[in-house]
A protein has these predicted regions:
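Alpha-helical transmembrane segments of multi-pass inner-membrane proteins
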Residues: 72, 99-103, 143-175, 179, ...
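Transmembrane signal-anchor hairpin modules in multi-pass inner-membrane enzymes, especially those
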Residues: 1-104, 134-148, 211-212, 377, ...
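Aromatic-anchored transmembrane helix interface
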Residues: 91-99, 112-134, 144-150, 154
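Membrane-embedded alpha-helical segments of multi-pass membrane proteins
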Residues: 57-77, 116-128, 193-202, 238-245, ...
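Hydrophobic transmembrane alpha-helices and their immediate junctions
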Residues: 83, 134, 215-216, 248, ...
Length: 445
């Protein structure tokens, strides 16, 4: 048998194998697998014309729980020895209060079993998202993992559009929403899930290009941007560039209070115009003066119904992820009976108030709204707010504003929620453990 070492290819292969770090490769593989499980999902290209789709999905939930639970365990085991110090910083009184409140909320939920089951999945997904900034060994590995997952996702989405449009594009055969016919959804179950993911991939493409990835960076940017347009997702499309501009301003603003004003004043204003238009005639009249649909494509009926539910249990809430499954007998005002068939309240903040109560909502705001900006201020004060920090800030801001018309916060394996947690965790770790060099790791040693 010929010795491969005598051949140039054999020498190259031997060099590659000699330099291969098995642990780092396993960590990268786990990161990519996680991203694909979240974004492509375990059930890609669902057939929305199939009346049994919901039953089929429910019957396969065990696979989802096992998959995310296993990935979370593997991710922690692969990197725990190097990231233990970073993970210890998550054990704060605020985070422990949040966990404690969730336990309390689940115990007093209207459907404790449902809440517990769904929070178990959410906890696994959150663990994976928190590990994502730590799992790749270097920033270059981080870039390559996210780029690989984005390219695979985009390739699958476009192949679906070309080869199987009946399960990649909303059409008249869809049982639930045939009026969305023509809107692209790719591998996702709905355009409103596809569109925010594509907006986030636009930010990823910009980030990768800024780090010198002049081939796949622009490719991800262009193809995700084009797909975003064809999804017909109005909220994500409108926010994509507006949030990027807002993030750009925040990244050059010095003071923390000025940053807070720039980030949160428009956010409060939008919430007042949207949900506020339901309980305030003044905000309703102001909304009607704007060149937009004052019902926000029918969302006002859902908000009115959700506000009524919130008033029933403002402190305890109805139970994590347990309310919208049990409202088939609910009542709304005349002409808005369809609101009881909604899957969520179409506003992340209102949805949390309904399900986990005001204390839970306040804790979420402290952890996921206020703390990330404070962490960014720490990074900015050290003059270390590079492209990676800017990516996290942009995704975080996009999530805050997207949540004004869609419910995704604490939404189990929702890809927008997953990427939002990645951004929040990234800012948390960067504020405490700066990246060492252009391709260094998060220094947690």
């Amino acid at each position: 048998m010929t010795d491969v070492r005598d051949r140039p290819f054999g020498n190259s292969l031997q060099a590659v194998l000699a330099n291969l770090n098995v642990l780092n490769s396993a960590r990268c593989f786990t990161a990519v697998a996680t991203l694909l499980c979240v974004m492509v999902t375990l059930e890609p290209f669902p057939d929305l014309s199939n009346a049994e789709l919901t039953n089929i999905a429910s019957g396969r939930m065990a696979i989802t729980y096992i998959c995310f639970g296993a990935l979370a365990t593997i991710a922690i085991l692969l990197s725990a020895s190097e990231t233990a110090l970073a993970l210890k910083t998550l054990w704060t009184p605020l985070h422990l209060c949040f966990v404690g409140w969730m336990v309390f909320n689940i115990a007093f939920s209207e459907s404790p079993g449902v809440s517990l089951q769904r929070f178990a999945l959410t906890a696994s997904v959150m663990s994976l998202a928190i590990m994502m900034p730590l799992l790749p060994a270097t920033q270059n590995d981080f870039n390559q993992c996210f780029a690989a997952a984005a390219i695979i996702l985009l390739a699958l989405c476009y192949l679906g559009i070309i080869l199987a449009p009946e399960v990649s594009i909303h059409n008249a055969a869809d049982l639930a929403e045939p009026f969305l016919s023509g809107d692209w959804r790719g591998t996702f179950v709905h355009k409103n899930i596809a569109s925010p993911v594509m907006a986030i991939l636009v930010y990823l493409g910009i980030y990768l290009t800024s780090t010198g990835a002049f081939l796949y960076g622009p490719a991800i940017l262009i193809f995700s941007g084009a797909f975003l347009v064809f999804t017909g997702g109005k909220t994500a499309s409108a926010l994509c560039l507006l949030v990027y501009a807002l993030a750009s301003i925040v990244c050059v603003t010095k003071g923390l209070w000025l940053k807070r004003a720039i980030c949160f004043v428009p956010l409060l204003f939008i919430n007042f115009l949207t949900v506020g238009s339901v309980f305030s005639d003044g905000f309703a009249n102001l909304t009607k003066q704007l060149p937009i649909d004052s019902t926000f494509t029918g969302r006002t009926d859902v908000w009115e119904f959700a506000l009524g539910a919130f008033r029933e249990r403002p402190i305890l809430g109805h139970g994590y992820a347990a309310f919208w499954d049990k409202i088939s007998n609910g009542q709304t005002v005349d002409g808005a009976e369809w609101a009881v068939t909604a899957a969520h309240s179409h506003n992340s903040y209102l949805d949390l108030a309904v399900t986990i109560g005001l204390p839970g909502l306040m804790l979420v705001i402290l952890i996921f709204v206020l703390a990330p900006l404070k962490n960014f201020q720490v990074i900015h004060a050290r003059d270390e707010s590079g492209p990676l920090t800017r990516l996290f800030v942009t995704i975080w801001l996009f999530g805050l504003y997207f949540g004004t018309t869609e419910s995704f916060l604490l939404d189990r394996q929702n890809p927008t929620w997953f990427m939002f947690v990645v951004a929040v965790a990234g800012l948390h770790f960067l504020a405490r453990f700066p990246v060492r060099g252009e391709s260094g790791t998060l220094s947690s040693k």
